[in-house]
Design a protein with these regions (language model features):
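Class I (Rossmann-like) S-adenosyl-L-methionine-dependent methyltransferase catalytic domain
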Residues: 1-41, 47-102, 116-131, 136-189
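A conserved beta-strand element that flanks and buttresses the S-adenosyl-L-methionine
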Residues: 108
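Short catalytic micro-motifs in class I SAM-dependent methyltransferases
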Residues: 111-115
Length: 189
């Protein structure tokens, strides 16, 4: 992960990042309402809003973010709400073995993948097949771009080898607050 990028995220978390709304996305709330609790991994969890919603619904949750400030906020929110979530400061392309040795019923990524470089995306996707449990789901939200850009935008449809274990089950196109194309994806084993 680029050092400048990491520092910029740390600076955002000294204030209040614009993406930290404190609102659980409707797609995540719908998933929680329609699936029994299991084991979840929240990649790029930020301040833990979705991780805590999953824990509140009975899920065993591990949240990962490379910004120490984000994880500090997430741990504080968990403590104040009386919820248990295993939060880690880590790079999603180099996860600790304690995380890699578990398989998850849900791997959630809200805006992490789309910020990775093409090489980092390849590394992330290579590890994904081992993280999602049989019958599990990888839910992804990101800016969606039809063309390739070097560092920003989700081109998961082009990059993910559909011959792998995970298959796209649904996609919901939308627009973010700045009218930038975005999409939710759900891949299942």
């Amino acid at each position: 992960m680029n050092l400048f990028r990491r520092l910029s995220f740390e600076l955002w978390y000294l204030r209040h990042p614009p993406w930290e709304t404190g609102i659980v996305p409707p797609e995540v709330a719908e998933f929680i309402a329609t699936h029994p609790p299991g084991c979840a991994l929240d990649l790029g969890c930020g301040s833990g809003t979705s991780s805590l919603a999953l824990a509140r619904a009975g899920w065993t949750v591990c949240g990962v973010d490379f910004a120490e400030g984000a994880i500090r906020m997430a741990r504080q929110k968990a403590r104040l709400s009386g919820l248990t979530v295993d939060f880690h400061v880590a790079d999603v392309t180099r996860l600790p073995s304690s995380i890699l040795l578990t398989s998850y019923d849900l791997v959630l990524d809200i805006g992490c993948f789309h910020g990775l470089s093409p090489l980092e995306r390849d590394t992330y996707l290579d590890g994904l097949d081992h993280l999602v449990a049989p019958g599990g789901c990888w839910m992804l939200y990101g800016f969606y771009l039809s063309g390739e850009t070097p560092l920003h935008g989700s081109t998961v449809g082009k990059q993910y080898d559909h011959g792998k274990r995970l298959k796209l089950t649904w996609r919901r196109n939308g627009m973010d607050k700045k009218d930038q194309p975005s999409a939710w994806f759900c891949y299942r084993v």
